[in-house]
């Protein structure tokens, strides 16, 4: 892959992980990149490492609270951080198990047209659920059932175009979560999944190819991490006072654009 292609893929990975679009759906608009397997696995590991670091920096208070909570849980004196950690784990386990089993085949579940249609439908659902959902619940109100349910929904994000952030935020809004709280818990759920994805991919690379650490990988890590941090900060600032409607419109627009590329013979 060229320098520009690495940069574009890293940007898409970083923004797609935190915004309700999904990197797989966005890459459907750039099939010439999606069709280049060389170096993509290593690039994905590097990009996800940067994204994970970005999430940990942005939500450092929650990360610290969960770390302390783990220690207090081991001492038999659970606190808020302990409960938050357990809720995140409850929401992570279903998606982690399924993802570990089918991750390598997930990208073939639908084609470009299917991913485009899913992008459009997801945008419509996000728009509708954001408008219909009341705003009364926060992360502190999370139940075990709610955590496990939202976590299980992440399994659907294995289908290109669904978007892990998109599906969890959409349902959270329908259930009455505050917008920032919906994004926050979605990102907390993402951390162990991103870590698991990176470990699985790295393990496969280590056993089947010779690992080469290059400047391209460092650039991908930095670019994806910075894109994720800026995208997340921007979205959190926006939804503090506004709705998810612009993100829903962008999803719909991306979907229409991909369909146009497919049916006019450019993809």
From Swiss-Prot:
It is found in: Cell inner membrane. This is Undecaprenyl-diphosphatase 1. Catalyzes the dephosphorylation of undecaprenyl diphosphate (UPP). Confers resistance to bacitracin. It is a multi-pass membrane protein. It catalyses: di-trans,octa-cis-undecaprenyl diphosphate + H2O = di-trans,octa-cis-undecaprenyl phosphate + phosphate + H(+). InterPro entries: UppP. The chain crosses the membrane at residues 6-26, 41-60, 83-103, 109-129, 142-162, 185-205, 217-237, 244-264. Bacitracin is thought to be involved in the inhibition of peptidoglycan synthesis by sequestering undecaprenyl diphosphate, thereby reducing the pool of lipid carrier available. One of its GO terms (biological process) is response to antibiotic. One of its GO terms (molecular function) is undecaprenyl-diphosphatase activity. Belongs to the UppP family. It comes from Paramagnetospirillum magneticum (strain ATCC 700264 / AMB-1). Keywords: Antibiotic resistance, Cell inner membrane, Cell membrane, Cell shape, Cell wall biogenesis/degradation, Hydrolase, Membrane, Peptidoglycan synthesis, Transmembrane, Transmembrane helix.
């Amino acid at each position: 892959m060229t320098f520009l292609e690495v940069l574009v893929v890293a940007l898409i990975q970083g923004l797609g992980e935190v915004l309700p679009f999904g990197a797989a759906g966005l890459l459907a608009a750039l099939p010439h990149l999606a069709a280049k397997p060389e170096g993509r696995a290593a690039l994905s590991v590097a990009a996800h490492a940067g994204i994970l670091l970005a999430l940990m920096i942005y939500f450092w208070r929650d990360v610290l609270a969960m770390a302390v909570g783990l220690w207090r849980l081991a001492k038999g004196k659970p606190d808020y951080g302990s409960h938050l950690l357990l809720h995140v784990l409850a929401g992570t386990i279903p998606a982690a198990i399924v993802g570990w089993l089918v991750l390598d085949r997930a990208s073939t579940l639908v084609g470009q047209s299917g991913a485009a249609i899913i992008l459009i439908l997801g945008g419509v659902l996000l728009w509708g659920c954001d408008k219909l959902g009341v705003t009364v619940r926060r992360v502190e109100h999370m139940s075990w059932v709610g955590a496990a349910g939202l976590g299980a929904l992440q399994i659907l994000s294995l289908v290109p175009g669904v978007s892990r952030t998109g599906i969890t935020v959409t349902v959270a809004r329908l259930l009455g979560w505050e917008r920032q709280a919906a994004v926050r818990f979605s990102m907390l759920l993402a951390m162990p999944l991103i870590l698991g994805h990176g470990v699985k991919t790295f393990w496969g690379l280590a056993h089947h190819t010779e690992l080469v650490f290059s400047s391209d990988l460092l650039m991908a890590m930095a670019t994806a991490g910075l894109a994720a941090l800026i995208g997340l900060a921007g979205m959190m600032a926006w939804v503090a006072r506004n709705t998810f409607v612009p993100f829903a419109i962008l999803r719909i627009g991306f979907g229409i654009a991909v369909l146009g590329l497919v049916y006019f013979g450019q993809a």
